[in-house]
Amino acid sequence: MPRTHARGTARDRLLDAAEELFVERGIAATGVDAVLGRAEVSPATLYAHFPGKDHLVAGYLERRHERWRATWDAALERCGDDPDARVLAIFDALDDFPTATSTRGCAFLAAAVEVTEPEHPAYRWLAADTHLLVERLRQLAAESGAADPDALAAEILGLYDAALASRTRRTVAGDGGPAPLPCRALAASAVVRHRA
């Protein structure tokens, strides 16, 4: 494996390596030794930053959550004051997100399959991701004039999840894969249909 982490702090190299490996292999299938090798750091360096693998997983999801939030914030900023565009900005953010073509799809949904105990240090980031999606979509739906913001938010979230699944299936299948679902267009129709 070529060296990909020549720069940055040891903590950043650990998080970069963990992200690459968790996306490639999954969390449970990735051992600490693989992360250490990819990051080119010692076990002592890992434990100086993270008490163990569970906390490394939490650090990975925390950083991923902050990157996703920043990407979505930027997409919202580009929409200006257009309330309909702001509801749909989640799809723009998905297009802009650096790992939109991952074969594992959403890092949080993939991690939720492996991190199921609420006491796990990473669980709070799974909850934070869901909270961000639900609450922000509800707020944006209300701002768009939806008669039932909860219903519109739920529909947009379902279409967002479908967009993630569609991208994953297409990435796995390559060029011969199914056409991507028109989730953004379906969401735009939902915004109009839910208007008060």
Stretches found by the model and what they are:
Residues 13, 17-55:
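Helix-turn-helix
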Residues 1-9, 16, 195-196:
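N-terminal intrinsically disordered/low-complexity leader segments
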Residues 86, 99-121:
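Amphipathic alpha-helical segments used for helix-helix packing
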Residues 10-18, 35, 60-64, 68, ...:
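Generic hydrophobic, amphipathic alpha-helix propensity
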Residues 59, 73-103, 153-156:
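Hydrophobic alpha-helical connector segments
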Residues 11-12, 32, 54, 58, ...:
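Short, structured helix-loop boundary elements
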